[in-house]
Amino acid sequence: MTTNIHAQRILILDFGSQYTQLVARRIREIGVYCELWSWDVEESDIRDFNPDGIILSGGPESVTEANSPRAPQYVFDSGVPVFGVCYGMQTMAEQLGGKVATSTEREFGYAAVQVTGESALFKDLEATQDVWMSHGDKVVEIPSDFVKIAETETCPYAAMANEEKKYYGVQFHPEVTHTKNGLKMLENFVLNVCGCEGLWTSASIIEDAIARIKEQVGDDEVILGLSGGVDSSVVAMLAHRAIGDKLTCVFVDNGLLRLNEAEQVMEMFSEGFGLKIIHVEAEERFLSALSGESDPEAKRKIIGHVFVDIFDEESKKLSNAKWLAQGTIYPDVIESAASKTGKAHVIKSHHNVGGLPDDMEMGLVEPLRELFKDEVRKIGLELGLPYNMLYRHPFPGPGLGVRVLGEVKKEYCDLLRRADAIFIEELHNADLYNKVSQAFTVFLPVRSVGVMGDGRKYDWVVSLRAVETIDFMTAHWAHLPYDFLGKVSNRIINEVGGISRVVYDISGKPPATIEWE
């Protein structure tokens, strides 16, 4: 009998902090299932979810302003432990009778917190804690049934607690790595205060996913779009373990893949792991559908629709294929406003979620839908997939379709593939690949004058992009050595006919996104 890995659960209410997904990932690291919902969730949804504890996230608003977000009153009537982080602490204080004021000194960065009282939150921790602050308001009066449990020189109530009700608030961010013992504080809350156990492990997630797939599809056949990326590869391995040859993988060479990627995918999965794979050559079909289209969102939708059309066609060739397996992961769900509350903001329409037609004829199998990327990678390792494949830099679902700016043409894709391969090869050669979080090349649809030999020529421009990030929510451009960049530029211009200029993108996120489209 499989372990019920969802038996114990934490609910995180999102007030808009850039770190909120990080809170959820930390709870999962502790070994406990959690979900991330919008702050204005209905009371009935919280009742149905039946959490063992609730975390109120940080956020950019000010509690002192009218109509700023508040926690549903049921949070404090439910009888479960509550942990407020930054804005979450402030709204907890305000809603329970305390006072919040705008601080004369905004605290941003490292701070030394002095623990002033015993608390379950700080169990087994020293009296001075290095933490990460990011706030403009502060609690100036705590509710009458709370006690102060920590302070800083400029923040009189850095943490507060009502031990009887199991309510806790901290003005800092325990979820970020800058807070040295932040994970221990979250462990104290989730394991000790809420009484959860570490049921959420890679082994138990695999066991649960296999059981769910078997239960969902029965004796039906399943079709999976295998791209060779992390998500679809892990789904393929899970489904293969669950239903064996009732899984048919469709590998679509859409003309938007990296150099030699098609050959590598077929070799690994068909020959190496023995999966049943149909190889569809569809470059012309995708490029024809994309012809004349330059809008990024429209390109994503077109690519998604053509994929589904191909799967539909291939499934009709199978006697009993009623299910389409997908590599949708939890951040896709959150970002595409397809979360269970439906209140998340659309950032980009992910091909796995927003681009699917309403009249799709197959049911969906999405075994990774509850998982973050780091969890998917850990599962992949346990399933026997190679480290280098699982920890390769992220590649967007629409592939080069969103790395060729504007209209997508075969000529542009071929040039970009070769330029990108040189960039990645040189990163490996210089031992820089694993020191950046993501690196790739972008094709710019503009011609620039160049000099070759005694003549002038007008050829295309590509941009190199490399970023460093912990969570991909924010990112810094990578300060790659000038000599390295010069070498990459020279190789691309000399070896890839048709490119006359190479530039380097030095934009951070924000204001820019990591991908250009």
UniProtKB/Swiss-Prot annotation:
EC number: 6.3.5.2
Keywords in alphabetical order: ATP-binding, Glutamine amidotransferase, GMP biosynthesis, Ligase, Nucleotide-binding, Purine biosynthesis
Transmembrane regions listed in the UniProt entry: none
Binding-site residues for ATP, renumbered to this chain: 227-233
InterPro entries: Class_I_gatase-like, GATASE, GMP_synth_C, GMP_synth_GATase, GMP_synthase, GMPS_ATP_PPase_dom, NAD/GMP_synthase, Rossmann-like_a/b/a_fold
Catalytic residues (UniProt): 86, 173, 175
Catalyzed reactions: XMP + L-glutamine + ATP + H2O = GMP + L-glutamate + AMP + diphosphate + 2 H(+)
Stretches assigned to the GMPS ATP-PPase domain: 200-392
UniProt-listed SUPFAM superfamilies: Adenine nucleotide alpha hydrolases-like, Class I glutamine amidotransferase-like, GMP synthetase C-terminal dimerisation domain
A GO term, aspect molecular function: GMP synthase activity
Stretches assigned to the Glutamine amidotransferase type-1 domain: 9-199
Any Pfam family matching the protein: NAD_synthase
One GO CC annotation: cytosol
Source taxon at top rank: Bacteria
UniProt pathway: Purine metabolism; GMP biosynthesis; GMP from XMP (L-Gln route): step 1/1
Role summary: Catalyzes the synthesis of GMP from XMP.
Subunit structure: Homodimer.
Descriptive protein name: GMP synthase [glutamine-hydrolyzing]
